[in-house]
Amino acid sequence: PLHSSAASDVYKRQNQYRGVNHPRKSLDSRFASSNLPLRGAKGWNYEGGVRVPLIVHWPGRTKPNSKSHALVTGTDYYPTLLEMTGLPALPEQHVDGVSFLPALRGKAHDRGAIYWHFPHYSNHGYQSPGGAIRLGKYKLLEYYEKGSVQLFDLEKDLGEQHDLSASKPDITAKLLKMLHDWRREVD
């Protein structure tokens, strides 16, 4: 159910709220926080809940108006700042992060897999406990209670509309194993 708010009233009146199984294809321009074409929103494992733009301003070091599609996560900031300032890496303090300084310099940056673990229900009531892994162009989501998975090719399907888990069982199994191994490692 929708929470009582002015925004949800507008959603209801315009019949644009369709839930996780029927994501919106368009949204009235009054919704400035729309993250279309991404699926989901804050508190979801879908890209609409985990994808955030990163803007870096480093005069004399980064090229103005440049873009990178490098995949980074919050744990990557610390090792990146250490490398930017020339300070020594302290692996015991940042075992999860990878410096993305190469990406800031316009070079290739492959940081490996990124993991998410949400062992709780979301505040909106649609996201059940689960986890996810992103490796390259693929992202796998696992829902713990049902034991179900979804696999998406984010290069071809950024909106996460086409589940490939049945048609790509090898990739699904590989990513699911990596996700389970990671969860055991950090538990």
Description of each model-found segment:
Residues V20-V50, R61-A70, T75-L154, E185-V186:
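C-terminal cap/loop subdomain of S1 sulfatases and analogous C-terminal strand-loop tails that border
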Residues L54-V56:
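Short glycine- and hydrophobic/aromatic-rich loop-to-beta-strand nucleating segment
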Residues E160-D163:
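Carboxylate-dense, calcium-coordinating segments in secreted/extracellular and ER-lumen proteins
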